[in-house]
Structure formats: C-alpha cells, structure tokens
C-alpha cells in the first residue's frame, strides 16, 4: 500500500509517530509541522480546508490564539459549566472577530488547517502555508456528493458493508484496498474490543489520569464504566456533550497503547522515512546537512538517538503489534523493527513487509 502512494505522486512518505497520529488536531498538526521544519529544506506546507481562503484561515487562527491566551479564564468558566470546547471557542471568536471568522470554526478541515497555522506560528517555522479547497462531499458526510465524490467516513462504512467503491477513489487506491481485503489485512476496531475492555478493567483511575486527552474527571467515568460488556455500551455510558464520540474513541486507543499526556506535549524526537521515489531521494539528500532531528527508515536506529526517541519507538512498535491483531488474518508481532523501506524509481523497488 505504501508503494501505491508513490504511484499516486507522493515523493517522500514519512511516518508521523503514533502519539501524534492519534492526537487531537493541535498536536497532530504540531507533529507534522515539526517534522517538515526539521528536514531543513522544505519551504511550503499545504493542507485542505472547506473555505479555501488562507487569509480567512489565518485570521481565524489568530482569533483562536487570542481567545486561548487573553481570555483563558473566561473559557475555563464556560467549560466548567458544561459547554463543549468548540462551542465556547466559536462563541468567543464570534464576539471578538465577527460571524464570518467564527463560521470558519464550524468545519472540521478548517479546524485542522487552523491548527497547522497555529503550529507554524508557535514554532516560528519558515514554512509557507497554502490551502486547497475541499469540494464535493463533506468531511463526515453519510452520502456521496452531487459530483460522485464521497467522504472517507462514507467510503469506509460502504466498503465494510460490502459495497463497490471503486468509482469513489483512484484506481491504484482501490486495487490496494481490494488486495488488502482479500489477504485479510483490513483492520477494524471491532477486533480490538476485548483487548480494550481488558485494558480498562485492569487500569486504575490514577493511571487513567495520565492518559492523553483525559481530564475533568473523565478517568472516574471510565473506571466506573469498566464493567461494560461491549465497546458500544462503554461509549454510550461515558459519552457527554464535552466528550464527543470521536474523541472518546481516540482516548480508548490511547488507553490501549498507553499513550500519555507527556507523549504528545513535546515535539517529535525523530522522523521516520517509510518510502521515497527519485525526487524524494533528492530531497532527502539535500536535507542531510540541514536536519534538526534524526531521520532514518530504521526504527531500531532511531530508538537509540535519545531517551524520548526510545519511548516513542517503543510506542510505535507496540501499536504495530496491536494493529496486527486488529485484522481478520492476524499478522506477526515485532514487525515494525524489521520493516524495509520502499524505494520507487527506475527499476529499483523494494517492497515493505506486508501491512495495510
């Protein structure tokens, strides 16, 4: 599947370490911006958005920064009253900057775009941002758009239900997905249900308190709900207005993988290269003397660069091992340290160990 990404015009594929890949928008974006900046020779970063207007997104990003710094106490008061964070932020931005700016915050791709812009600002990164407007179906749309495009949410569910979604994605992506399905490599969280329930039943509230994204007493709600007999029952028991379902699913994976708040608060300790083509090779070669972090395809090599890197590498390896249990056909453990890099270009092509 990684090789198919190179076919799809990706020049160099680097791995966002699992603590950041599973993190909320702010930390997810921070991880991406930090890694691109650390290469030392990347000038631009692009991301999707519903509005497609970098000026408006930049204004919304500034508004969010002002609200979080200058009006933090006011926000905390509203949050303690039971309002959700997006609601409070949108209301405050609207009052301070107007309805047009506040409206930007109501769309998920805009929210991630704002997180990228704020990460660039926080790090004083030289990256120049640009945005590509999302067209067709919305981010979480349950139906294809008028032009036939579909959201990833819809495609995943449609495919899981046995639907033929070849017209909803590039042909190379469809073939890769079909091959993975036929090999029993399409993962599902349903295969992790017993593991998650076991982990929750054997973790005390003090340990839960340190898990990423848990706060405001959620550890006690989780602990009380540990008797749940299914993930669905568990999620319905702990769900609140302040904790939407998407965040709760992330938190359950944080618990399973032992990803803690400290793991997502700092910048990534390394950059892992999964694949590259000829152009990507030149980018990596040019960056060699300019890098601010260690970059390598070898997780074992990266793990020894610092204690923080060792912790992150252990989390990555563990996540891959658990991922292998989330497939219809269980994969071998300890595969992450043996993964081979994929090189596409000319006649040289090295396939990675099979993994979806």
State each model region's role.
Residues 1-8, 12-15:
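Single conserved hydrophobic/aromatic residue that forms the stacking wall/gate
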